[in-house]
């Protein structure tokens, strides 16, 4: 008993010390190499399916990114972040931590450290594993591990993992509805979808190969958080497993039949078999249209820890809604009956609503203390992106960068704080916010000099 108490005290002290030492934003990853196997300490081993969702943890899913010589893809980057010194004070003077192995999963909403689901993480000492892109950018989905404050506003990332969620040709499109289809998956968009190299969906020709980051919604549907056009590249598909046939070694993801007979399964499947309802990401070495997709890798999508007492924050779309006390986000059962709800009226909760939730796991259920509505079908919702850092590559208020992200702050309605547009220039310390990224450029709505 004495040893257990001592161990708990040391763990809490270590986590608090990490937060107290925070302060500056992290840099991006550089270099090449394969992705590191992923299995965060403190998460459940195996890949649990809690009545249709993804549980468990311990991805460990091989090195089969598409950056190998055989595929010529973007590859992956695994590195320790280097401090950029953004003077953010992230984690300093914090209100305490829940657990040292807290997990956040969602789309990146800001840079300077990084912001995921409104929680700002210091990434100075984080291990970064980024696949399918050269660096982490706004709109990419990610899983962040590390201690957080009790109010879920700041944290210290120890590990950041990010991969693309869908890649393939756009085979059909409904621009009026803001949706398209890739590999049998219906991709929906909203005001917060980042368009990396196009003004919007209407500007992308049918048949274009797209790389999409997004959060799984109902089976066969992905809510896009970032869309990029790509040259021909091998497929990636993310979705909920249905129609699993362990004899034929096939299952479906939306309208796509997947053959996994020759695939490498992520280490998480060693303890808990692949099952219907699991959310997975699959990769193939070659594309085959039409017909089943033969994949080379099947791995759990960013796994959610199921251990009681672990702090978890998720950004995703509500499914299986049965009331505020029972619904799912990213396959995880959520109880928001006692949550503080912001961003819209509580009566707006329901299937298809995009939310951010934060709380503590208890017997496989995420008991949330905070819930923010981000998008309500037919109504919309708040979209906000944030950059914290110094101005670089300044040409004019219409063309500069912060944290490598292009910014346009030339609009007549841009609000400046602690200065004016005349104070913009390379080296200026700023916080920039806006609600749209079009053609890869953040359209600034507010610039505050720091």
Functional labels for PLM-detected ranges:
Residues 9-20:
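Bacterial N-terminal signal peptides
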């Amino acid at each position: 008993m004495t040893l257990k108490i001592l161990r708990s005290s040391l763990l809490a002290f270590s986590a608090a010390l990490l937060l107290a030492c925070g302060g500056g934003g992290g840099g991006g990853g550089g270099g090449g190499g394969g992705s590191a196997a992923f299995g965060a300490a403190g998460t459940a081993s195996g890949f649990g399916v809690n009545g249709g969702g993804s549980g468990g943890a311990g991805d460990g899913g091989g090195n089969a990114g598409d950056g190998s010589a055989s595929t010529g893809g973007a590859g992956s980057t695994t590195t320790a972040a280097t401090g950029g010194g953004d003077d953010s004070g992230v984690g300093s003077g914090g209100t305490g931590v829940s657990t040292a192995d807290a997990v956040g999963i969602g789309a990146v909403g800001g840079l300077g450290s990084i912001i995921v689901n409104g929680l700002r993480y210091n990434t100075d000492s984080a291990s970064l594993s980024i696949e399918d892109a050269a660096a982490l950018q706004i709109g990419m989905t990610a899983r962040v591990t590390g201690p957080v404050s009790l109010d879920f506003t700041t944290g210290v990332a120890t590990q950041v993992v990010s991969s693309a969620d869908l890649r393939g040709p756009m085979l059909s499109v409904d621009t009026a509805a803001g949706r398209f289809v890739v590999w049998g998956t219906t991709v929906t968009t909203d005001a917060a979808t980042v368009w990396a190299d196009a003004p919007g969906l209407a500007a992308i020709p049918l048949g274009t190969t797209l790389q999409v980051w997004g959060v799984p919604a109902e089976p066969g549907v992905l809510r896009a958080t970032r869309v990029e056009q790509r040259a021909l590249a091998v497929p990636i598909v993310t979705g909920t497993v249905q129609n699993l046939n362990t004899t034929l070694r096939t299952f479906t993801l939306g309208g796509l039949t997947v053959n996994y007979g020759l695939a490498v399964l992520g280490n998480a499947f060693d303890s808990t078999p692949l099952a219907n309802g699991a959310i997975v990401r699959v990769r193939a070495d070659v594309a085959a249209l039409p017909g089943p997709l033969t994949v080379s890798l099947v791995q759990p999508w960013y796994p959610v820890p199921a251990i009681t007492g672990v702090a978890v924050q998720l950004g995703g779309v509500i499914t299986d809604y049965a009331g505020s006390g029972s619904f799912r986000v990213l396959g995880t059962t959520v109880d928001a009956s006692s949550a503080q709800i912001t961003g819209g009226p509580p009566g707006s909760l329901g299937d298809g609503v995009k939310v951010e939730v934060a709380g503590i796991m208890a017997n496989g259920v995420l008991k949330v203390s905070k819930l923010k509505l981000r998008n309500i079908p037919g109504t919309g919702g708040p979209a906000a992106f944030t950059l914290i850092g110094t101005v670089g590559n300044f040409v004019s208020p219409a063309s500069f960068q912060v944290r490598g992200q292009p910014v346009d702050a030339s609009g007549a309605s841009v609000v400046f704080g602690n200065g004016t547009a005349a104070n913009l220039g390379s080296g200026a310390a700023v916080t920039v916010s806006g609600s749209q990224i079009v053609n890869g450029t953040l359209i600034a709505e507010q610039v505050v000099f720091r």
